[in-house]
């Protein structure tokens, strides 16, 4: 039986905010018996070891390339159940600085390899910190975290992911600036009537995060005061800045961190 819009929206809210691992379905309980972690955040199917091999060969459940927190079947399922809800989340945007100039100094193949190293390094760290990749676009990566997926310390994990990404990119000589913010956004599967959809987050706080990231120089992580407070991190001696952001009516206070 098809779910109503209200049921779909509640599913999205509870899954993101409450606990992504509390689905009480028989197949979920069964999958949890198979070794071993890491697992799909929705159905609990294992990705590695013998359990992962069984899931891939018998059930056709491989790890999603875009969101390693999901298996491919669950990602397809949530995309087909379009809907969403306003939820508390933490958001991260990371951009390569001076990408146009870099591309002019490199062959197209070498530039593509640099972008790929950026994508691979960033998404691996986001997955390790239980974040969800929203998009890989051009020279940027966007991701978000919620309590149901990453735990109650999801804002802290977002900041930790930003520090790891910054350190990883510095080691690879890839100039990246990062912005981190937290607030309420609309989260869910959005798309067209023909069934094409993406798991996305939209709203003022998402736009604010993108604008914050645009102000970060290479090697800098600009974290909003709101995110720092929610993470329980004391600003201490961290450099303070007040940003005027395009399209944002109010100034935004941030602190400067590094990897």
Feature annotation, model-predicted:
Residues 94, 182, 223:
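A conserved hydrophobic position in a structured secondary element of the catalytic/binding core
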